[in-house]
């Protein structure tokens, strides 16, 4: 989910000394071991004697083997033998019964932080902080399985509502939390609404009720959704296209995001990360309609830190060179997301708002509209500070709530996040990953075989 800030000016170079770590996997790591069976030669060897005794002995051996095979078949129904369905509906905890979820991509720290990899004190701190990592890795595994299914499932002619609900239903099924009972959505589920922003719209668009928009073959659609487990949010996004003409635009964002992740680390300045991202992104160009177009960073869209139950933390990660001297710190979680555009490289609020969130620092205001009071109580109980959309309110059975919702926004209690768009006729793309700065290494939680 995008963060929007003002751009600064400074120029720093990308350090290419990072070594590429091993990717995490998105498959269950428990496998059934093969059981050796007695060979026919052994059976014949045991029955060398003649007469009924030898025949009875052979028969008994066969009878003994059958129960063993049946028992093994029974154990094959354990969680390790299960696989995900299409669409995804198998609880992720059934695929990983011991809560042993795959690590993300492990990146060793560089330069003055390289000592952290083997430092005993840092290793001890790493071992002490495993509980929250389990929640993050569980959310990341759900994100991988859902997005990989969605990327193959999405086709031209589908409505945005169909796509959004397909992704969200899958996330809820894998977490085991449908979010219909009071407080259930705060235990696990959607970290924020599914963003499906098309072409010049870069971020924060999800269909409201009655939306009939259909995705077409020539569209460039950003698919941005989050999964949370106990408030630990994994935020990751990819760009879905059908026409290969847009491949260079998509690749520019992927490469720029990877450059930002490579540069990021403990005590690294935000300005350095922004410079690294911009250098890579703007080295690309794309030919559309016979015109060669440069790919520009959308300079007022940024990555961000992620807090507990808070998708946009207190820090932003620029995607252009600037003068921000803020540093990343040990233990922080960040989403690095990059946006490339063939337009102005600058977005503005446009179209109908769908995304909202209760402000963590919301003022205590006397609400005079009764519908606003009841709506605020429902938002607080069901979402807390997690972002939500109008469809989520519809799903909970709310009716005629717009007056109350607008009152909460105007009172400063709820923040509205309107769609962010470049100029019409332009194309925009996005790539995003979430990582955590562990004491000994940088773990890219959302990394998968797909991106």
UniProtKB/Swiss-Prot annotation:
Cellular component per GO?
cytoplasm
Question: What are the protein's UniProt keywords?
Answer: Aminopeptidase, Cytoplasm, Hydrolase, Metal-binding, Protease
Enzyme group, top EC level?
A: hydrolase
Which residues are noted in the entry as a divalent metal cation 1-binding?
Answer: 224, 235, 432
Q: Which GO biological process entries does UniProt record here?
A: proteolysis
**Which segments show compositional bias classed as Polar residues?**
19-28
Residue positions annotated to bind a divalent metal cation 2 are: 235, 304, 337, 432
Which reaction equations make up its catalytic activity? Release of N-terminal amino acids, preferentially methionine, from peptides and arylamides
Q: Which family does it belong to?
A: Belongs to the peptidase M24A family. Methionine aminopeptidase eukaryotic type 2 subfamily.
What biological function has been recorded for the protein in this entry? Cotranslationally removes the N-terminal methionine from nascent proteins. The N-terminal methionine is often cleaved when the second residue in the primary sequence is small and uncharged (Met-Ala-, Cys, Gly, Pro, Ser, Thr, or Val).
Write the protein's name.
Methionine aminopeptidase 2-2
Please name the source species: Leptosphaeria maculans (strain JN3 / isolate v23.1.3 / race Av1-4-5-6-7-8)
**Lineage, top ranks:** Eukaryota, Fungi, Dikarya, Ascomycota, Pezizomycotina
């Amino acid at each position: 989910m995008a963060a929007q800030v003002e751009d600064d000016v400074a120029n720093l170079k990308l350090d290419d000394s990072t070594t590429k770590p091993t990717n995490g996997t998105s498959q269950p790591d428990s496998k059934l071991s093969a059981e050796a069976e007695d060979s026919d030669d052994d059976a014949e060897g045991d029955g060398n004697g003649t007469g009924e005794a030898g025949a009875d002995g052979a028969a008994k051996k066969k009878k003994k083997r059958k129960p063993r095979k049946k028992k093994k078949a029974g154990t094959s129904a354990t969680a390790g033998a299960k696989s995900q369905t299409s669409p995804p509906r198998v609880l992720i905890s059934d695929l990983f019964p011991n809560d042993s979820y795959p690590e993300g991509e492990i990146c060793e720290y560089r330069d003055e932080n390289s000592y952290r990899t083997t430092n005993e004190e840092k290793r001890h701190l790493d071992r002490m902080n495993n509980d929250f990592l389990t929640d993050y890795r569980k959310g990341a595994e759900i994100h991988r399985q859902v997005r990989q299914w969605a990327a193959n499932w999405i086709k031209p002619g589908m409505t945005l509502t169909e796509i959004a609900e397909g992704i969200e239903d899958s996330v809820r099924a894998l977490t085991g939390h449908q979010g219909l009972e009071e407080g259930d959505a705060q235990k696990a589920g959607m970290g924020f609404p599914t963003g499906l922003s098309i072409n010049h719209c870069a971020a924060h668009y999800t269909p409201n009720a009655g939306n009939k928009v259909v995705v077409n073959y020539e569209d460039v659609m950003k698919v941005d959704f989050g999964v949370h487990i106990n408030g630990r949010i994994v935020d990751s996004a990819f760009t879905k296209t059908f026409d290969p003409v847009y491949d260079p635009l998509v690749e520019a964002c992927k490469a720029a995001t990877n450059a930002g992740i490579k540069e990021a680390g403990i005590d690294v300045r935000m300005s350095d990360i922004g410079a690294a991202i911009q250098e890579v992104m703007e080295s690309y160009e794309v030919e559309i309609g016979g015109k060669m177009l440069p790919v520009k960073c959308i300079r007022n869209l940024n990555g961000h830190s992620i807090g507990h139950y808070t998708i946009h933390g207190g820090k932003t990660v620029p995607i252009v060179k600037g003068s921000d001297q803020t540093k990343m710190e040990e233990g922080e979680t960040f989403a690095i997301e990059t946006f490339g555009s063939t337009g102005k490289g600058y977005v503005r609020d446009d179209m109908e708002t769908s995304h909202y969130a209760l402000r963590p620092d919301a003022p205590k205001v006397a609400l005079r509209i009764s519908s606003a009071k009841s709506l605020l109580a429902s938002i607080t109980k069901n979402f807390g500070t997690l972002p939500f959309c109008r469809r989520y309110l519809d799903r909970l059975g709310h009716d005629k709530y717009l007056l109350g919702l607008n009152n909460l926004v105007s009172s400063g209690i709820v923040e509205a996040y309107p769609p962010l768009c470049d100029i019409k006729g332009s194309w925009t793309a996005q790539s995003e990953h979430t990582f955590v700065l562990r004491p000994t290494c940088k773990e890219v939680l959302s990394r998968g075989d797909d991106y």
